[in-house]
Amino acid sequence: MSSLLNISHCSYHGYSGLTSRGGINTVENHRWVWHNNGVRLSFPRAESSINITMGCTLQRGIAKSLSQENLVELSDENDDLCPVECVTEFKTDDELLSVLEKSKETNSLVVVDFYRTACGSCKYIEQGFSKLCKQSGDQEAPVIFLKHNVVDEYDEQSEVAERLRIKAVPLFHFYKNGVLLESFATRDKERIDAAILKYTSSES
């Protein structure tokens, strides 16, 4: 029986976040899966069924200028973080492919956070990533937020991580119309925010 992964969504409102201290080298595109000329994903046919009710929405507007002190204060308070269901966890290639296929119906951007439980930088960016799918926004720019633990229950590299040759985390992938547009490793929420704005603008 095929697995069923339900995705609930909320809305996204961009604003400035904490900057990273110390960069992580960007991971190259995985050419064995993708080509620079836009060849689509070549995973096996999906057997999983994933229900997407609606995409997270992005509100374009002037970014709020918040000081680092204010951001630290906000992170310590219960400031209505996006519910856990907003950032959906997937475990298999089939689940990822199913989301990518369904995202074509709404022209949604799919953002994937690849993480490891024992990774300090992954924990650092997790809250910021959750905040990126919070608050009401513009219905014209749907965004789907996903995450994947690159280490499986046997403390081995996951099938997805092995297939995508993921070597560094936290790593973020940006997909649209089933195509990987960009990937980079970072703990800087502003960089993720900028990529989302770039790929959900009217020109993209």
Swiss-Prot record:
The keyword Chloroplast applies. PROSITE patterns: THIOREDOXIN_2. This is Thioredoxin-like 4, chloroplastic. It comes from Arabidopsis thaliana. Residues 1-27 form a transit peptide. The active site is at residues 119, 122. GO terms for cellular component: chloroplast; chloroplast stroma. Keywords: Chloroplast, Disulfide bond, Electron transport, Plastid, Redox-active center, Transit peptide, Transport. Its main location: plastid. Probable thiol-disulfide oxidoreductase that may participate in various redox reactions. It is found in: Plastid, Chloroplast. Disulfide bonds join 119-122. Gene3D superfamilies: Glutaredoxin (3.40.30.10). Belongs to the thioredoxin family.
